[in-house]
Curated annotation (Swiss-Prot):
Record field: catalytic activity: L-thyroxine(out) = L-thyroxine(in); prostaglandin E1(out) = prostaglandin E1(in); prostaglandin E2(out) = prostaglandin E2(in); prostaglandin F2alpha(out) = prostaglandin F2alpha(in)
The protein's name in its UniProt record: Solute carrier organic anion transporter family member 3A1
GO MF annotations in UniProt: oligopeptide transmembrane transporter activity; organic anion transmembrane transporter activity; prostaglandin transmembrane transporter activity
Keyword Membrane carried by entry: yes
Organism listed in the record: Mus musculus (Mouse)
Residues exposed to the Cytoplasmic side: 1-40, 101-106, 204-222, 287-344, 411-414, 563-571, 649-705
Gene behind the chain: Slco3a1
Coiled coil: none
Tissues expressing the protein: Widely expressed.
Residue intervals on the Extracellular side: 61-79, 132-174, 244-261, 367-386, 439-539, 598-630
Function: Putative organic anion antiporter with apparent broad substrate specificity. Recognizes various substrates including thyroid hormone L-thyroxine, prostanoids such as prostaglandin E1 and E2, bile acids such as taurocholate, glycolate and glycochenodeoxycholate and peptide hormones such as L-arginine vasopressin, likely operating in a tissue-specific manner. The transport mechanism, its electrogenicity and potential tissue-specific counterions remain to be elucidated.
Membrane topology: Multi-pass membrane protein
Family of the protein in this entry: Belongs to the organo anion transporter (TC 2.A.60) family.
Length: 710
């Protein structure tokens, strides 16, 4: 006994020393773990970056008309600026998504954010490289109080600058225009890695059942960005464009004056700063987060085997993926694989259908929402600022809430692939019904002198309509601008000049022949339509419901997509998704909606002898065509959702689900399905408290294409 004590004591001492050393090493490891090893911190950083991205994109839209007036641009030029972002994004998205999955994703995202910040700063640069704005040269014919009135006997023929000079300036090549295009291309290039790499990074480091919630939060912030962008645009355009260079107290115009140009450049500087600082956070995250980096995750994972989170995910649960990039291959060889990988993804009917369905859903948003402000102005006689303010405070926040609720429902209900696609189908049907109701919510154009009715309120059609009448022939009225006025006779006139008003107080209007001369006056704005206010309130409520419900389909669609490809192709699959979203969902729809809206025009403005913008629409035809295009796209999306559901459903042999939710990918392939036990009975009953199903593979390609059907 005594002989053993020294040995035992020595052994115990060595054991204690080893345990002490191990404890010290563990303490050092714990001390080395930083906040950047937490996926939730990455989520916050990614949300900040996507919020800034959404803000700068919407801000550009909010100041497009300001840019048009500031740099004498035409509408086609402004359209090119708006589409330059997508061009820059399309140029690199496939390459970044493919090679980025093998690189340091957080750093690539951070680099993209810095490039976006540079693009935002360059967007503001034209204001500092050009001359100061001279609003006296901004208009050709305006009265002393900024109103277009009848000018008889050439009383204002010598007012203002030479019209020919203004026309030449407006059509001249503008280097600032090219700089704006280059800045937007940079913004598009910088945005390339943010979404696909960010989504795949989050999905790789959270539990399967939590992935939908995290991704839902991510896209909620992306959609919330436009609300911030519109609000920022409303604020900046109320500040004079050269406020930092001149004393604004000497200005004799206000933001309500059509000659006013706001400080459009200020928002780009603010967005650039936000993009830069949110990008810096990305450089602190590791290439791959350590397991159990979140202390609160262990208790949540207790119901699942711990080994699921300690070992790497299999490529497809059966074999190494044949298209997995080989790190030893040269860059040229890897580039040659990209077409094969793309073909491989598109040969998966589930992947293809869900991507096309997402494109149709985004097409509705990109087309319908792009002209929604204009639609509210035309249908319900709202001002531009009021329309943008309502959109920023109602429809966009509801869409944000819908995306978040969609991700939350997928998580709480533990929806499988079939459950998620059923949810998308149901959401699509309800939102389509909301769009159908829009067909009946609107206002008529009303009587407009010389356009829908003759002067004197006599109905007429076709060639009998002419805005020029004997009562205003000598007024030299121009159609380069649209400043409608409502006459005491209840008829809308294109301007006070077309109403024959010879005074800036809008009295003595010769064309109001149905009222006594002393009452022949007009007030600014269109004449109100009966019942329009009630229709607008109903439209606003239905729009909120439609935005809320329609947005709930986004997260289930993304979840289905990333579950139908192998993990090593996840980032590239998301890149293909965002590529097709831009090719099919963002670029064509505004052109289609815009062409359809232009076809309903009743009266076009003219500038410098050329056709300008439409100033008056047939509201009924406008409403039917505008809403019908959206309904057609939503219906096509429903057909694609149904096809996806059929592709999944016909390949199930058995689907059994209990109360505890989803079976992880590794558990599914490791415990219930391999190439050796295909056709055999599933794992015995000791595998309880899990979602179980046997997936009836039609061929080996389905095994490679479908990582899981959770």
């Amino acid at each position: 006994m005594q002989g053993k004590k020294p040995g035992g004591s020595s052994g115990g001492g060595r054991s204690g020393e080893l345990q002490g050393d191990e404890a010290q090493r563990n303490k050092k490891k714990k001390k080395k773990v930083s906040c950047f090893s937490n996926i939730k911190i990455f989520l916050v950083s990614e949300c900040a970056l996507m919020l800034a991205q959404g803000t700068v994109g919407a801000y550009l839209v909010s100041v497009l008309t300001t840019l048009e007036r500031r740099f004498n641009l035409q509408s086609a030029d402004v359209g090119v600026i708006a589409s330059s972002f997508e061009i820059g994004n399309l140029a690199l998205i496939l390459f970044v998504s493919y090679f980025g999955a093998r690189g340091h994703r957080p750093r690539l995202i951070g680099c993209g954010g810095i490039v976006m910040a540079l693009g935002a700063l360059l967007s503001a640069l034209p204001e500092f490289l050009t001359h100061q704005y001279k609003y006296e040269a901004g208009e050709i014919r305006w009265g002393a109080e900024g109103r277009d009135v009848c000018a008889t006997n050439g009383s204002s023929s010598d007012e203002g600058p030479d019209p020919d000079l203004i026309c030449r300036n407006r059509t001249a090549t503008n280097m600032m225009y090219l700089l704006l295009i280059g800045a937007q291309v940079l913004l598009g290039i910088g945005a390339t890695p943010v979404q696909p790499l960010g989504v795949s990074y989050i999905d790789d480091h959270v539990r399967r059942k939590d992935s939908s919630l995290y991704i839902g939060i991510l896209f909620t912030m992306l959609v919330f960005g436009p609300a911030c962008g519109f609000i920022l645009g409303s604020f900046c355009t109320k500040i004079y464009v050269d406020a930092v260079f001149i004393d604004t107290s000497n200005l004799d115009i206000t933001p309500d004056d059509p000659r006013w140009i706001g400080a459009w450049w200020g928002g780009f500087l603010l967005c650039g700063a936000l993009l830069f600082f949110s990008s810096l956070l990305m450089f602190g995250f590791p290439q791959s987060l350590p397991p159990h980096s979140d202390p609160g995750m262990e208790s949540e994972q207790a119901m699942l085997p711990e080994r699921e989170y300690e070992r790497p995910k299999p490529s497809n649960g059966v074999l190494r993926h044949p298209l997995e990039p080989d790190s030893s291959a040269s860059c040229f060889q890897q580039l040659r694989v990209i077409p094969k990988v793309t073909k491989h993804l598109l040969s998966n009917p589930v992947f293809t259908c869900i991507v096309l369905a997402a494109c149709m859903e985004i097409a509705v948003v990109a087309g319908f929402a792009a002209f929604l402000g204009k639609y509210l102005e035309q249908q319900f006689n709202l001002t531009t600022s009021s329309a943008n303010q309502l959109l920023g405070m109602t429809a966009i926040p509801c869409a944000c809430l819908g995306i978040f609720l969609g991700g939350l429902l997928v998580k709480k209900l533990s929806l499988s692939a079939l459950g998620a696609i059923r949810m998308a189908m149901l959401v699509n049907l309800v939102s389509t019904a909301c769009y159908v109701s829009f067909l009946f919510l609107g206002c008529d154009t009303g009587p407009v002198a010389g356009v829908t009715v003759r002067y004197g309120n006599n109905s007429a059609r076709g060639s009998a309509l002419d805005p020029y009448s004997p009562c205003n022939n000598n007024c030299e009225c121009q159609t380069d601008s649209f400043t409608p006025v409502c006459g005491a006779d209840g008829i809308t006139y294109l301007s006070a000049c077309f109403a024959g008003c010879n005074s800036t107080n809008l009295t003595g209007c010769a064309c109001l022949t149905t009222v006594p001369p002393e009452n022949a006056s007009v007030v600014p704005g269109k004449c109100p339509s009966p019942g329009c206010q009630e229709a607008f309130l109903t439209f606003l409520c239905v729009m909120c419901v439609c935005s809320l419900i329609g947005a709930m389909a986004q997260t289930p669609s993304v979840i289905i997509l990333i579950r139908t490809v192998s993990p090593e192709l996840k980032s590239y699959a998301l890149g293909v998704l965002f590529l097709l979203l831009r090719l099919l969902g963002f670029i064509p729809p505004p052109l289609i909606f815009g062409a359809g809206i232009d076809s309903t025009c009743l009266f076009w403005s003219t500038f410098c002898g050329e056709q300008g913008a439409c100033v008056l629409y047939d509201n009924v035809v406008y409403r039917y065509l505008y809403v019908s295009i959206a309904i057609a796209l939503k219906s096509f999306a429903f057909i694609l959702y149904t096809t996806t559901w059929q592709c999944l459903r016909k390949n199930y042999k058995r689907y059994i689900k209990n109360h505890e939710g989803g079976l992880s990918t590794s558990e599914f392939f490791a415990s219930t399905l391999t190439l050796d036990n295909l056709g055999r009975d599933p794992v015995p009953a000791h595998q309880t408290h899990r979602t179980k199903f046997i997936y009836n593979l039609e061929d080996h390609e389905w095994c490679e294409n479908m990582e899981s059907v959770l």
